[in-house]
Amino acid sequence: MAATSSTSSQSFDIELDIIGQQPPLLSIYTQISLVYPVSDPSQYPTIVSTLEEGLKRLSQTFPWVAGQVKTEGISEGNTGTSKIIPYEETPRLVVKDLRDDSSAPTIEGLRKAGFPLEMFDENVVAPRKTLAIGPGNGPNDPKPVLLLQLNFIKGGLILTVNGQHGAMDMTGQDAIIRLLSKACRNESFTEEEISAMNLDRKTVVPLLENYKVGPELDHQIAKPAPAGDAPPAPAKATWAFFSFTPKALSELKDAATKTLDASSKFVSTDDALSAFIWQSTSRVRLARLDASTPTEFCRAVDMRGPMGVSSTYPGLLQNMTYHDSTVAEIANEPLGATASRLRSELNSDRLRRRTQALATYMHGLPDKSSVSLTADANPSSSIMLSSWAKVGCWEYDFGFGLGKPESVRRPRFEPFESLMYFMPKKPDGEFTASISLRDEDMERLKADEEWTKYAKYIG
């Protein structure tokens, strides 16, 4: 295994987006893996040098991508201010040759199994774990903005890119990966790309004047736990990929469109699939939960459009919508009614106002530890979903001479009950959902007749 980098000679001090200042986000890395077939092993050295040169070009124009996230001014009752400051000359690249490792995946094995989650172990294919677990995660350890790992496997390679989540959301990470692919091809960056990458993060969300906290933040401020109550131990959970063909998605969208609420004129494929997942998980959870158990659907929303910011802005600019009901109501209502609930919260003006309210509240708060986008989600009955369907990773070739990726996956990390992701949508329209559920819910879901009509288990 080799890692390449050198100490930075640059000088910069970039305060993170106010929404990126949430303490939980500052300890997380978001990972994404792109898989390419390699027919000629003699290409590997050239691939490494191409990526190294691309990282140099990217860092010359945007030195902060090689920086680190550092929190300054921490004291009693103050979580400090997190910034990107210099770290190295280029983002660190780890090169790992797994071709002689019998436990490592091969391109043929991945293909035959449908690129399952279990074959993308973050401890093998990623340069750093998602969660701050294990060595290197102390308060004084560096948190690089960007980390990469190039894994050589028999017949192919897996390129994993880790982004520090306080510094970027997945849309921002995708913008950086796209520019890295351009840099590897020795293509120039446009003025628009340069301008978006260098936007002042402190002013992206204008603060509200004379703001008083209202119900718009109810789901985002953690309530103090009752004295003496220990939090329940997390349930034993597992991760799995499920895929949905374009035909299955079209049928789900048709079913939702036929049963829409009177208040809705339209739902997207993403709305219909999200609703189907909420309904299906609620249905299987009725086996262990009371019908009147509250359920909440927390759905990440890219705020670049509503805030009038470039779609390629690289920071963290997302919020969530929240939908409350009971397990039985969601399990039993028409699909279109559930999809309409999800669509109803996507009003741009309302989203913008809610995001400004959150930013304004956080700006005036010395101790931000009570703020979380999933502050009141109960993993036993709720869902927390991020859709990466629009992320462009299927298009990037990095000038490797290998064509476009054969698969794009998020590596497997510790199970986290009710956390879910939609992978970047395949060019043919197929969606893959990465779903974490407690074991008994997962087993019931895999056997559920309505679910298996549309979803294929990959593992």
Swiss-Prot record:
GO terms for molecular function: metal ion binding; transferase activity. It comes from the Eukaryota. The keyword Protein biosynthesis does not apply. It is an enzyme of class 2 (transferase). The keyword Transferase applies. Keywords: Calcium, Metal-binding, Transferase. InterPro entries: CAT-like_dom_sf, Sec_Metabolite_Acyltrans, Tri101-like_N. It holds the Pfam family TRI-like_N. CoA binds at residues 253, 266-269, 302, 318, 343, 386, 390. Pathway: Sesquiterpene biosynthesis; trichothecene biosynthesis. Its EC number is 2.3.1.-. Ca(2+) binds at residues 218, 221, 376, 449. Gene3D superfamilies: Chloramphenicol acetyltransferase-like domain. Belongs to the trichothecene 3-O-acetyltransferase family. Trichothecenes are sesquiterpenoid toxins that act by inhibiting protein biosynthesis. 3-O-acetyltransferase involved in the biosynthesis of trichothecenes, a very large family of chemically related bicyclic sesquiterpene compounds acting as mycotoxins, including T2-toxin. The biosynthesis of trichothecenes begins with the cyclization of farnesyl diphosphate to trichodiene and is catalyzed by the trichodiene synthase TRI5. Trichodiene undergoes a series of oxygenations catalyzed by the cytochrome P450 monooxygenase TRI4. This is Trichothecene 3-O-acetyltransferase TRI101. It comes from Fusarium sporotrichioides. The gene is TRI101.
